[in-house]
Amino acid sequence: MQGSLMLDIGGTWLTAEDRQILRHPEVGGLIIFARNIEHPAQVRELCAAIRAIRPDLLLAVDQEGGRVQRLRQGFVRLPAMRAIADNPNAEELAEHCGWLMATEVQAVGLDLSFAPVLDLDHQRSAVVGSRAFEGDPERAALLAGAFIRGMHAAGMAATGKHFPGHGWAEADSHVAIPEDARSLEEIRRSDLVPFARLAGQLDALMPAHVIYPQVDPQPAGFSRRWLQEILRGELKFDGVIFSDDLSMAGAHVVGDAASRIEAALAAGCDMGLVCNDRASAELALAALQRLKVTPPSRLQRMRGKGYANTDYRQQPRWLEALSALRAAQLID
């Protein structure tokens, strides 16, 4: 049975302390960062070592493209999503990019990348910027839908982020508590559109650590109004809800790590991420042990179903995707 906590490790191999914490059944996933990565073979070995201890863990990474891609040496340098949108055949290129990303990520033993970004580029948020496909909500939904088709064709579940949209809030939730003061109706007409259009295609969503004070005084990731009433109720979304990193400044409004993971799960998150802070991860773990949470079975849907080896580079679709992205001058 998978647990409700996703955490991280400090280096390129498992320490004795890492092995010990991963054995706790409350731990359900592990996310890797650039510090954990040297080259594809090393990542493959790391994933195998993790699965030897806990074969049921979800193994994740942020491999969006552009400036947010942790897997670099030995991997294709993916373009920023905004660069794709600038091409006349953007929909086709987005699908190629989604397939290529998902194939490479799964080939080293990881299950999923937290992608695609569904935020809109309103030219306000530096933390979103070129990570977004577009400022136009319908076109963003179209291109993100193509990216998701590529991911699904490669066997990877898709996670849209950051619900209900981070693009209007100017502050960076990694270091501050952003606010979006617009009304719910304004948000419905713009930032919520990609999430609404793609609710039936997405396997998971990640809410924003942003406060929308006209809707709820809590950040979206701690808000039953956003997660239960709007996402589950109105949009009929039945996939997994991952919290964004509960160590980020935007989550600190709720209290310590134990309070944060408890609040996230109570609001409707299925799994809470606690990264870059082992002491906080241990606090969250202790809270889950006390709460005796039973994670939903839908977490199993997030397991990768694609290549677990390197022969994908001989596949016609790989060569086709590379050729198309090179022709558009999106990759080297």
From Swiss-Prot:
Intracellular or extracellular location(s): Cytoplasm
Residues of the site described as Important for catalytic activity: D172
UniProt keyword Cell wall biogenesis/degradation present: yes
Keyword Cell inner membrane annotated: no
GO biological process: carbohydrate metabolic process; cell division; cell wall organization; peptidoglycan biosynthetic process; peptidoglycan turnover; regulation of cell shape; response to antibiotic
Pfam families linked: Glyco_hydro_3
SUPFAM superfamilies: (Trans)glycosidases
GO cellular component, as recorded: cytosol
Pathway membership: Cell wall biogenesis; peptidoglycan recycling
First-tier enzyme category under EC: hydrolase
Record field: catalytic activity: Hydrolysis of terminal non-reducing N-acetyl-D-hexosamine residues in N-acetyl-beta-D-hexosaminides
Its EC number(s): 3.2.1.52
Main subcellular location: cytoplasm
Keywords, in A-Z order: Antibiotic resistance, Cell cycle, Cell division, Cell shape, Cell wall biogenesis/degradation, Cytoplasm, Glycosidase, Hydrolase, Peptidoglycan synthesis
Molecular functions (GO terms): beta-N-acetylglucosaminidase activity
Signal peptide (residue range): none
Binding site for substrate: D62, R70, R131, K161, H162
Catalytic residue positions: H174 (proton donor/acceptor), D244 (nucleophile)
Xref: PANTHER family: BETA-HEXOSAMINIDASE (PTHR30480:SF13), BETA-HEXOSAMINIDASE-RELATED (PTHR30480)
General function of this protein: Plays a role in peptidoglycan recycling by cleaving the terminal beta-1,4-linked N-acetylglucosamine (GlcNAc) from peptide-linked peptidoglycan fragments, giving rise to free GlcNAc, anhydro-N-acetylmuramic acid and anhydro-N-acetylmuramic acid-linked peptides. Contributes to intrinsic fosfomycin resistance in P.aeruginosa.
Cross-referenced HAMAP family: NagZ
Similarity comment: family membership: Belongs to the glycosyl hydrolase 3 family. NagZ subfamily.
Assembly behavior: Monomer.
Protein name: Beta-hexosaminidase
Name of the coding gene: nagZ
